[in-house]
A protein has these predicted regions:
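Flexible, low-complexity junctional segments that flank or bridge functional domains
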Residues: 23-322, 326-333, 394-396, 426, ...
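Gly/Ser/Thr-rich loop/hinge elements
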Residues: 288-393, 436-442, 451-472
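N-terminal signal peptide c-region/cleavage motif recognized by signal peptidases
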Residues: 18-20
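Extended amphipathic secondary-structure runs
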Residues: 199-206, 365-422, 426
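C-terminal soluble interaction/assembly domains
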Residues: 397, 405, 409-411, 415, ...
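Bacterial N-terminal signal peptides that target proteins for export
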Residues: 1-8
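Long, C-terminal catalytic modules of enzymes
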Residues: 408, 460-464, 469, 475-492
Length: 492
């Protein structure tokens, strides 16, 4: 989960890091942080001791991946490249909940130090030219398909340049999200910059183009990225009327998105939302890394359908397996302390405090007995209350690869409700190793985040997301909002 620092905290973090860097070079800092990441995960992550297929990648990468990453550390020469190498190691676990996040202001998704004036998008299994900077001569046209770069097949070129460093290319969502960077120089010394030549399929012809570096202006880079990947605008929570039916925008699940005002808007229009004309719930770009993301999504569902109707349709929690270590216990003890220090939380959430107290007690018992793990029951399923469905029309839930973590938890509920159709494109995936521990790494340049418990009985499998059914998959340009809306209209 990305942690945002205040300006003063960011300055302090950079000052501390700069003090370290004056005595050590960035390569040494990277080696130090890689080893600390390895040691923390090996000592505390559930996958190290929980059996099953979900743990296999963790176990095969924890040591081998460290050696792989350490072999690249000599190329680290800046804070940005330090972040790239730590991200490479973290992404190698193929676990969306293992992450390293810079404590300084990281590079924007629109950032590049050089580019050929061209951006690509991942469309229907191919890298396709999605943007050409106005005035650039000798560039491939929009729609051309990239076949090779620097004489490498494009699949190999993309894997070497993007996988691990920019995202996990084993997922469709990461291929979409990282595709604009295929031909860019993002200041990562461990991969090539702008390729010298690339071959494109233009209509029926294969043609080679020289990739001539162009000035990388912020405005052009942002325009290029937005032409390639759906990117929500400034207002991420709202309701508008499209083709005579409500279109509910939930393009963020972050805490600062403005939930009180949005929920008030939902409640004021509830009769319309439940009408026979149907409605659209737009979850594109709904990054769900916040601790409260799932509760935000459930809060929307409960307002539209009522808690009495949704409660029996929530997925069964099953059992949770905890890794019994002192560090994991400390996380819960600290959390309990914060809960008990908040008078409002004490008044409103006594059952949560009781549950957390029981978990801390279970940690104590397991540690005293020398157990590596212990199991706690999750929320039991609830019998059907008999409440009627208040929503009269069809509900289309629109998703894409920006739907992550808590957004997927929300879909676990929404897809169980009647007359709901999932449409759009594949979501991201998430692992069964959940609820993040966050710790500062020795350099002060980065935080490590990892799930400290295993939801081994989750009904949606490990690293599984959602893919709309045939006929409900959008194959057009996802950044053409008029086309997307016209297509959604055909689903009613």
């Amino acid at each position: 989960m990305q942690r945002l620092l205040t300006a003063s905290a960011a300055v302090l973090a950079l000052a501390l890091a700069a003090g370290n860097a004056s005595a050590q070079n960035f390569s040494d800092l990277a080696r130090q942080d890689l080893q600390a990441t390895h040691d923390a995960l090996k000592a505390n992550h559930p996958a190290a001791v929980v059996p099953g297929a979900a743990s296999e990648t963790f176990r095969s990468w924890i040591d081998a991946g460290l050696q792989d990453a350490l072999s690249k550390a000599g190329q680290v020469n800046s804070g940005e490249s330090h972040a790239y190498l730590l991200r490479y190691y973290a992404n190698g676990f193929r676990d969306s909940n293992i992450a390293t996040n810079p404590t300084f202001e990281a590079a924007s998704p629109f950032f590049a130090t050089g580019w050929p004036g061209v951006a690509t998008a991942w469309r229907n299994g191919e890298y396709v030219v999605s943007y050409v900077q106005p005035g650039v001569r000798g560039a491939p046209p929009v729609g051309a398909v990239v076949k090779t770069c620097n004489l490498q097949p494009i699949a190999d070129f993309a894997k070497a340049k993007l996988d691990g460093f920019e995202g996990d290319l084993t997922t469709e969502a990461a291929r979409v999200r990282t595709a604009p960077y295929l031909l860019w120089n993002r200041n990562n010394p461990m991969v090539g910059g702008v390729p010298s030549t690339c071959e494109f399929q233009v209509g029926r012809r294969a043609r080679e183009y020289k990739m001539s570096p162009q000035p990388a202006t912020a405005a052009n880079l942002e325009a290029a990225y937005r032409a390639s990947v759906f990117t929500p605008g400034a207002t991420k929570l709202s309701i508008e009327q499209v083709d005579g039916r409500p279109w509910v925008h939930v393009n963020s699940l972050e805490d600062n998105a403005g939930w009180d005002a949005f929920y008030a808007q939902v409640e004021s229009q509830i009769a319309t939302l439940r009408g026979a004309q149907g409605l659209v719930i737009d979850l594109r770009g709904a990054e769900g890394g916040s601790v409260n993301a799932t509760s935000r999504g459930y809060g929307l569902a409960n307002r539209i359908w009522t808690p009495e109707f949704t409660v029996s349709r929530q997925p069964e929690a099953g059992q949770i397996t905890y890794r019994a270590t002192a560090a994991n216990r400390q996380w819960f003890a600290d959390t309990l302390n914060r809960m008990q220090s908040d008078p409002r939380f004490v008044q409103e959430s006594a059952p949560v405090i009781e549950q957390t107290q029981a978990i801390v007690a279970a940690f104590d018992a397991a540690l005293a007995a020398g157990q590596q793990t212990f199991v706690m029951p999750g929320r039991p399923s609830v019998a059907d209350t008999g409440a009627a469905n208040p929503v009269q029309g069809k509900v289309v839930v629109l998703v894409d690869g920006g739907c992550t973590n808590g957004c997927l938890d929300t879909l676990d509920l929404l897809t169980r409700l009647p007359n709901v159709q999932l449409a759009g494109s594949a979501t991201d995936v998430d692992s069964i190793f959940i609820e993040p521990t966050v710790q500062r790494l020795p350099s002060n340049y980065s935080d490590l985040s990892y799930g400290h418990k295993a939801w081994t009985t989750r009904q949606r499998g490990n690293n599984q997301g959602y893919v709309p059914a045939q006929g409900l998959t959008y194959t057009g340009n996802p950044t053409d909002e008029a086309a997307v809306r016209a297509w959604v209209g055909t689903l009613f």
